[in-house]
Amino acid sequence: MPSMLGSMMVASTSAPSLQEALENAGRLIDRQLQEDRMYPDLSELLMVSAPNSPTVSGMSDMDYPLQGPGLLSVPSLPEISTIRRVPLRLSWLNSLDTCSVTAMMGVFPPISRAWLTIDSDIFMWNYEDGGDLAYFDGLSETILAVGLVKPKAGIFQPHVRHLLVLATPVDIVILGLSYANVQTGSGILNDSVCGGLQLLPDPLYSLPTDNTYLLTITSTDNGRIFLAGKDGCLYEVAYQAEAGWFSQRCRKINHSKSSLSFLVPSLLQFTFSEDDPIVQIEIDNSRNILYTRSEKGVIQVYDLGHDGQGMSRVASVSQNAIVCAAGNIARTIDRSVFKPIVQIAVIENSESLDCQLLAVTHAGVRLYFSTCPFRQPLARPNTLTLVHVRLPPGFSASSTVEKPSKVHKALYSKGILLMTASENEDNDILWCVNHDTFPFQKPMMETQMTTRVDGHSWALSAIDELKVDKIITPLNKDHIPITDSPVVVQQHMLPPKKFVLLSAQGSLMFHKLRPVDQLRHLLVSNVGGDGEEIERFFKLHQEDQACATCLILACSTAACDREVSAWATRAFFRYGGEAQMRFPATLPTPSNVGPILGSPMYSSSPVPTGSPYPNPSSLGTPSHGAQPPTMSTPMSAVGNPAMQAASLSGLTGPEIVYSGKHNGICIYFSRIMGNIWDASLVVERVFKSSNREITAIESSVPIQLLESVLQELKGLQEFLDRNSQFSGGPLGNPNTTAKVQQRLLGVMRPENGNTQQMQQELQRKFHEAQLSEKISLQAIQQLVRKSYQALALWKLLCEHQFTVIVGELQKEFQEQLKITTFKDLVIREKEVTGALIASLINCYIRDNAAVDGISLHLQDTCPLLYSTDDAVCSKANELLQRSRQVQSKSERERMLRESLKEYQKISNQVDLPSVCAQYRQVRFYEGVVELSLTAAEKKDPQGLGLHFYKHGEPEEDVVGLQTFQERLNSYKCITDTLQELVNQSKAAPQSPSVPKKPGPPVLSSDPNMLSNEEAGHHFEQMLKLAQRSKDELFSIALYNWLIQADLADKLLQIASPFLEPHLVRMAKVDQNRVRYMDLLWRYYEKNRSFSSAARVLSKLADMHSTEISLQQRLEYIARAILSAKSSTAISSIAADGEFLHELEEKMEVARIQLQIQETLQRQYSHHSSVQDAISQLDSELMDITKLYGEFADPFKLAECKLAIIHCAGYSDPILVHTLWQDIIEKELSDSVTLSSSDRMHALSLKLVLLGKIYAGTPRFFPLDFIVQFLEQQVCTLNWDVGFVIQTMNEIGVPLPRLLEVYDQLFKSRDPFWNRVKSPLHLLDCIHVLLTRYVENPSLVLNCERRRFTNLCLDAVCGYLVELQSMSSSVAVQAITGNFKSLQAKLERLH
């Protein structure tokens, strides 16, 4: 079943202004998204340009800006929030109080478990609630180290999800961990949520320690296990499924010494150096680098290789070297704060490309290291270089904060530093330092907070957080940063980071609050959306960023957030500012302007002295620059009288600055859509099936992410819809206008007392800004609505068989999908969405499922993409497709007619060619005609297309041209169908052939192919139906198609009032006039309008055209004469008689023209000039003068010249003689190579041909001259004596006249005969002539025979007298005898 594609979807009818608004809003989002992606790398925040250019920070007040005197302070802005406390079991506490036990405590975040070892036993429990206890007591030795490992793939049974590695002084034991009630391969991050933890009782592996005390165990993501030895060595436990020839199932490798160390007992491994135990191992899984820290502060770097399977030590730096380097960087700082190092932490490439390692000292100093050159993300580690020293709070000159000290635990995670410092023996202080509030600010600015923790901290760990995968596709891969976006950019979709702290009192779980969590805290604390602290929050983060954060709460649809949402909405409008005009800084900004003009993003002047706040241009959360281009629209004052008036007061070159509300909406929307906005819609994935590769097209975005984005978009859309009713326009605040104007008036101090003009100008500027923002917000609102519906459609497609739906699309749409982004889908690709919806519905139809349900769902989900008309279209399509499966002919016709009625309702919007193609397949040709005509009528209800056509198709009538073209496109569906039927009716039937193999006959590849007879029948029926149309423009289109299809006979059978005017018009204006005039005379002749037919034929003959040959022109004239005669026979109009006479004269001249052309073709066709002349003779009919002067005379066509003067009645004896002489000489010249008899025959034929034409007009047939010239030629050429007489006899010259001519020639005594020595030649000719008479007297009429006989006798007597007077000779005697014999015969006839 072919796909309906676009026929399923209504064509776009959106106004251009709406499309332009979407484009403008899209550009705003593009720029905001670009700004969000331009966050600095950690090395940029630390102002480190290269590894050899180290820097120091933490000594300036602005490094920790919220803590200095006179700086912005938000006391109620917490950094962390306690979730819960879970105490330890009382029995364990009692055990821990015993001094003789060996105990350790830690956290396994991947399985949400805390663990505790007491001597040889290990306990694990869920730190969330203290439940789900598991323990292992199968060891006899004290546990020294514990590690959790995600096993290598393919080694263990699927139910073994993790490995628990326990090290004792004697051996290393590896246990399996599984979970109850969890299906294998569920892929859940925290499996323990779904079932209890189970420790497998029997160890999977056990190997001896060789008397090596192991202090810590760590693993890589790919399952490698590393152990730190008290002897200062780094070990690895290598394990595999089965033992090999040269390898054990499980073995221990010492990477600090020989690679064969597992073969040598530790007792034999002597060392001359003092042991420096390794106390910490950290692994950078993002780069495959391993770091170790020893008890004495030595840091070593190991490269695990690109694939994580290698092992090589590349660098080792002692604590003294680190302290020396730090001292050289921070020269004014006491070096004691740089040691000892209590913790090292990996900085993954998702946070920084240039900094790889962080070390924290006991004084809270952070030391940043790099292992390779900057800006080379793929480089392998080759060094360990200190690049930055970050001092903790308290080191600035004016700081009153107590410095950290006695730090014994530290945790660094994504820019957040947590440190526990010993306040006393019973309590710790927890420090939280981070730059989440200032992620874009350079140099790095951080906030800090301290809180007291009960008990001594044993472990501090970050809980594995939910991470949204970046959607990286071929279209956006060059725009997506490698590092992760700051928290402020992702806070709408990621929960706050969770941490757990373990102490002897139990587990403390807490969140690191995001800016949105801090705002929620302020709103709840202040019980409303206003208050000084909330206002400070907006100033701290700047209006636009604060508004974006505020929208997360305001747009929340959660029931528990209902009250907070209302408070956030109030804060959004109260502190979100207003659109303004920004003027050049010709006047200082007074302190009473407030956050609107004094906003750091827009202020052109510094903050006034004495302000309680720092210059916010160095405080803003994104702070992408002083003037973000996305949020201001420059407006020139040139050429605008009002602005020129303002320039008198110094207000030159203002530009619109949108409010924080407007910008916040843009920011929030860009962050919701940011992960998919410029991503490809689809990606190609290759699957293997039955040993072959299959390429499938899949959605680039998983459905879970779509659901998340849709939820956020829905909240934003509802917020915009809910708050667009304010009188100030969408999201406007009517109460702020007066205040803003007052503030503006407070800023400007006009001179010369022109206060009123200034007030008016400022008011106008303000309203301009408000209007501009209103228009922009309306566009954004449309973009949000369109985005929601487009993504909802995409989700719906993903919920179905996406690959199948896309596979049903035409190849061009599939290729277009690959290069289409989600932004394009939202803003531009109406055709793509239409095709996808059509494919979806076709899948339902193909599966014999009703489309009503999915159609209603589409209308509810995406009405902008699938309207009521689309639903009608879908219903019609369903009826059409169902009709294919119906066996009953009457039922099928009913369904087809019903589908036609549905399609006709929206005929101007359906994909007409596609629907008609399907109607053709089911042979519903009536539907093709009626639907196409209905569509044409609906597309042009006012008949503008016909008006355009009848008025000569003027170029300036753009609307007329458009409607005209739309109508023709509709008609084309009918004519294309007619053409298809014509082709099938003329197709040659398949000839029988011998089967290629035995068996039943193979069916034709196209069962829908019509037979010749069927096609012809359907054609006739469809043509009759088309002829009934009253649509004049369609009739014209049908006529034109019939002409192009060479079906003129069918055309002339049409009885329509539109045909004659169309043919007349086309005969005048169309380039193919000949064809239309030819049809026109045939139309007139068929309708017995003979006079009109004759006149059209005459025009055809006269037309200057290379399309008509001269022969055709003669045929046209001949037909015209016949039609004219028929007309005169019917009516006796004098004009018709005169016209007939003109035609006959025209025919006579035309024949001469044809004679000239044929003569040129026959004699001179190889000359190029002659070819031109022949073509010219074809191009038009010419008059006599032109034919003579330009053709007959230049080319010396004597026969043609004779015909011309004969036609013209021009008599010039000399010219006539010359022409006859030329004719005879030309004929003799042409036959010079022939024999005498052939030459005589050829000349005779020519003379007889011409003689019969001209013999009746003696002026043009000078017999005397012709006979004399011919006889001279006969005598010269020694031809037969009777040649001329025989020729003249064939011409029909009477013997008496011929005798008269010869007699006069003889008597003229022409000396020519003596010169050629044939004085008796004429007498011989006369003898032949008379002999013919004697032998056949019937050559002379009976009534004239006696007189002619007497005349002959008299003539013979005279000839004998002449002969007697001649000197005697044999010839004379012979001729004398001949005449005497002839005389006797004549006397007998007398």
UniProtKB/Swiss-Prot annotation:
GO biological process: atrial cardiac muscle cell action potential; miRNA processing; mRNA export from nucleus; nuclear envelope organization; protein import into nucleus; protein localization to nuclear inner membrane; protein localization to nucleus; RNA export from nucleus
Cross-link for Glycyl lysine isopeptide (Lys-Gly) (interchain with G-Cter in SUMO2), residue positions: K739
Ion transport recorded as keyword: no
GO CC, one annotated term: nuclear pore inner ring
GO MF terms held by the record: structural constituent of nuclear pore
Post-translational modifications reported in the UniProt record: Phosphorylated. Phosphorylation and dephosphorylation may be important for the function of NUP155 and may play a role in the reversible disassembly of the nuclear pore complex during mitosis.
Segments for region (Disordered): 598-632, 984-1011
InterPro entries: Nucleoporin_Nup133/Nup155_C (IPR007187), Nucleoporin_Nup133/Nup155_N (IPR014908), Nucleoporin_Nup155 (IPR004870), Nucleoporin_Nup155_C_1 (IPR042533), Nucleoporin_Nup155_C_2 (IPR042537), Nucleoporin_Nup155_C_3 (IPR042538)
Positions of modified residues (Phosphoserine): S1056
Residues glycosylated per entry: S525
Subunit structure: Interacts with GLE1. Able to form a heterotrimer with GLE1 and NUP42 in vitro. Forms a complex with NUP35, NUP93, NUP205 and lamin B.
Protein family (similarity comment): Belongs to the non-repetitive/WGA-negative nucleoporin family.
Full protein name: Nuclear pore complex protein Nup155
Organism: Rattus norvegicus (Rat)
Taxon lineage: Eukaryota, Metazoa, Chordata, Craniata, Vertebrata
